[in-house]
Swiss-Prot record:
GO CC annotations, alphabetized: cytoplasm
Binding-site list for Mg(2+) 1: D102, D106
Binding site for an all-trans-polyprenyl diphosphate: R111, K193, T194, Q231
Name this polypeptide is given: Geranylfarnesyl diphosphate synthase
Top-level enzyme category: transferase
Recorded name of the encoding gene: idsA3
Organism: Natronomonas pharaonis (strain ATCC 35678 / DSM 2160 / CIP 103997 / JCM 8858 / NBRC 14720 / NCIMB 2260 / Gabara)
Subcellular location: Cytoplasm
Length: 341
């Protein structure tokens, strides 16, 4: 089995566990329309990558064989038991909350191959569903059974993460009306909008299980690094992957004039990025635009940045015991920049 296959298997195994926990902790109850809308995207699919990272970090910290311990009664370092699965559900429902509100702001029609929540239901219900998931996430983080001090610290991390996600989204909106965005500003936006939830997923188990500050900070840094690499790989795939694999038009970021590490680098090389493609480009036009970006070194620049971030993230895992769960966390970092979807 290749490392990619190993990662896919680890994610699939934990995805099933997390999906069952979501059904258990977020039942469709009265008012049914609200809770049906809240569950809608969670039931539509998703890799469950962030909760997988949380559960693997817990397994590595506790130095137990993967899937050998009950996630609902997980051994902490001081010797008490913590429900790390509830924390994993908390992280996943935050992810779903952000997707619902993102789709509203972008007026998108589809998400995960199904109509967006505001299309399937209505705008008011979608807003309420997102708000419900946001508040439920804090309930689930409190349900871990960790001692008060560790619970409060985990809640503080979750609250800070949610604030930063909103700040990142605000920066993204602001960038749409600016032509002078720098690469540094873009990476800050990516850190807040995308990477901080990976950082929370990696560091919260260390908080709940009673790890020292050095370990918490190292795992937080791991999450930030791989989260930024994840977004850069998404930017690369938009240009390099076929449309049928992407589930959207290849080069859509160019058509929509979105700021990415690639286009910002190209702009700095003197390329008229906004003029690379028309509003309804042909495949040949997209291919020519990608070649222009290749020739400018912009695609290689982004690839190298993503790989450097992954290397940095993996080095931060030195705080963990050498075990299979840690190796899987390293393999996930590689997977994020090697994936083709």
């Amino acid at each position: 089995m290749t490392s990619a296959d190993h990662v896919e298997s680890a994610i699939a195994e934990r995805r099933e566990i997390v999906n069952e926990a979501v059904s258990e902790q977020l039942p469709v109850q009265k008012p049914e329309r609200l809770y049906s809308a809240s569950r809608y995207l969670l039931d539509a699919g998703g890799k469950r990558l962030r909760p997988t990272i949380l559960l693997l970090a817990a397994e590595s910290l506790a130095d137990v064989e993967p899937l050998s311990a009950d996630y609902r009664q997980f051994p902490s370092l001081p010797g008490d038991e913590v429900d790390v699965l509830s924390a994993a559900v908390s992280i996943e429902v935050i992810q779903s909350f952000t997707l619902i509100h993102d789709d509203i702001m972008d007026d998108d029609d589809l998400r995960r191959g199904v109509p967006a929540v505001h299309r399937e239901y209505d705008l008011e219900t979608a807003i309420l569903a997102g708000d419900t998931l946001y508040s439920k996430a804090f309930e689930y983080m409190l349900d871990t059974g960790a001692p008060a001090e560790r619970s409060v610290e985990a809640l503080d991390e979750l609250a800070t993460t949610c604030t930063e996600i909103c700040e990142g989204q605000a920066l993204d909106v602001d960038f749409e009306n600016r032509s002078d965005v720098t690469t540094e500003e873009y990476l800050e936006m990516v850190e807040f909008k995308t990477a901080v939830l990976y950082a929370a997923a990696a560091s919260i188990p260390a908080i709940l299980l009673g790890s020292d500050d050095e370990t918490v900070e190292a795992l937080h840094g791991y999450g930030l690094d791989i989260g930024r690499a994840f977004q850069i790989q998404d930017d690369l795939l938009d240009l390099t992957a076929p449309s049928d694999e992407l589930g959207k038009q290849r080069g859509s970021d160019l058509v929509e004039n979105k700021r990415t590490v690639i286009t910002l680098h190209a702009r700095d090389q003197g390329i008229d990025v906004e003029g690379l493609v028309s509003d309804d480009p042909s495949d040949a036009e997209i291919e020519a635009a990608v070649q222009t970006l290749e020739d400018a070194g912009s695609i290689d620049f982004a690839r190298e940045m993503a790989l450097d971030l992954v290397t940095s993230g993996k080095e931060r895992l030195d705080v963990l015991p050498e075990n299979e769960a840690r190796q899987l966390l390293e393999d996930i970092a590689d997977f994020l920049v090697e994936r083709s979807y």
